[in-house]
A protein has these predicted regions:
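Pocket-lining segment of extracytoplasmic ligand-binding domains
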Residues: 84, 172-272
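Short, glycine-/small- and polar/acidic-enriched structural segments
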Residues: 26-160, 164-167, 184-190, 208-212, ...
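Bacterial N-terminal signal peptides
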Residues: 8-18
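N-terminal hydrophobic or amphipathic helices and topogenic motifs
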Residues: 16, 20-57, 306-335
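Short, solvent-exposed loop/beta-turn-alpha elements that line the ligand-binding surface or hinge
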Residues: 106-108, 121-122, 217, 292-302
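Bacterial N-terminal signal peptides that target proteins for export
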Residues: 1-9
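Secondary-structure end/capping motifs
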Residues: 233-318
């Protein structure tokens, strides 16, 4: 009888220990340098994860390939990335699952994605670009490449366009190369566009940029959040709390004046988009040019978006295995 009590007591203690560890585990998450990641970064800065009783470690990696490798090797528990990269990761490691998406809507005076060139160095119109052999800098196997493909197809370029691409795995590196006029034409996102357009050395004029396209008519895609299935299985409560904190951050960001966001969250923005940058070294003109978008609450990845991107990736030869929506998407944890 005494022995039975000990067995039961041991089982209860083990169960309690397991319950305590579930919320005490640290979620190791890497964010890409895109606006959709800001709610996660602000949730950490504002203590919203702490308020939910979870520990989140944000790991700064701007290189897509390095971020994917860290996730696939178990050095990260989750990453935020674009849909194309997320599906590519899921195809490479069957123990990954997309648990939600982050969506932002640009303000009326801003453009989230642009095809740009330097006047006098690159083509000055899209029509002129299509008649040249100039290289186009773009992030490799990403939604930016997907949207560039759709843009060129809509303008009658159906063959040979991939030979024109100069691929990058790091969005920050692409922005730096374009700013230095090493790449004549590039697909860039905000806030890199505003930064490049306004930054200039002392006693020099700002760069003269040509907007070849703002991707009007090309449907934009959300950012996706990918978790390791083992983490989801063992710490479902942390995943749910993570999304609650992100939803709270979205509401707070949307209700906070832009000036306050930039002032209070400057370190957050710089840490995400310009790793290692000194606040004092960022020109005020560049900060003033950054337009904070409106954010939407975390949402599921739609089956329509999933099917469109999978089809594109298969045609490009990026996906060889068949991916099923139900196998790589789990929407149970969204608020």
């Amino acid at each position: 009888m005494v022995r039975m009590r000990r067995v039961v007591l041991c089982a209860v203690l083990c169960a309690l220990a397991g319950a305590g560890t579930a919320m005490s585990a640290t979620l190791r998450l890497s964010l890409p340098p895109v606006f959709e990641a800001l709610p996660v970064a602000f949730a950490e800065a504002w203590g919203l994860f702490d308020a939910e009783g979870i520990s989140v470690e944000l790991v700064g990696i701007t290189d897509n390939q390095e971020r994917s490798t860290a996730l696939l090797t178990g050095n990260l528990d989750a990453v935020m990335g674009d849909v194309s990269r997320s599906l590519l990761d899921c195809s490479a490691g069957r123990d990954l699952v997309i648990t939600g998406t982050a969506i932002s809507t640009p303000q009326t005076d801003s453009v989230p994605l642009g095809l740009l060139s330097h006047i006098g160095f690159g083509a000055e119109t899209l029509a002129a670009l299509l008649t040249t052999n100039q290289k186009i800098g773009v992030s490799y196997r990403t939604d930016d490449e997907y949207m560039l493909d759709q843009l060129l197809i809509a303008n009658g370029v159906t063959q040979g366009w991939s030979m024109r691409y100069m691929y990058f795995n790091d969005a920050l590196q692409l922005a730096v190369w374009f700013a230095a006029e090493t790449v004549p034409v590039a697909v860039l996102r905000e806030p890199y566009i505003s930064y490049i357009a306004t930054y200039h050395p002392p006693n020099a004029a700002p760069p003269d940029l040509a907007w070849l396209s703002t991707f009007t008519g090309v449907r934009s895609l959300p950012s996706a959040v990918v978790f390791r299935k083992a983490f989801v299985r063992d710490h479902a409560d942390i995943v749910e709390a993570f999304y609650r904190a992100c939803a709270a951050a979205v509401e707070r960001i949307n209700a906070t004046p832009r000036e306050e966001l930039v002032e209070v969250g400057l370190d957050v923005v710089l840490g995400l988009f310009f790793q290692g940058a000194n606040v004092a070294g960022v020109p005020q003109d560049a900060l003033d040019a950054i337009s904070i978008p409106h954010f939407e609450a975390p949402a599921p990845l739609s089956e329509e978006t999933f099917a469109e991107v999978v089809s594109w990736m298969q045609k490009k030869g990026y996906l060889y295995d068949r991916l099923e929506y139900a196998a790589v998407v789990d929407n149970r944890f969204l608020p």
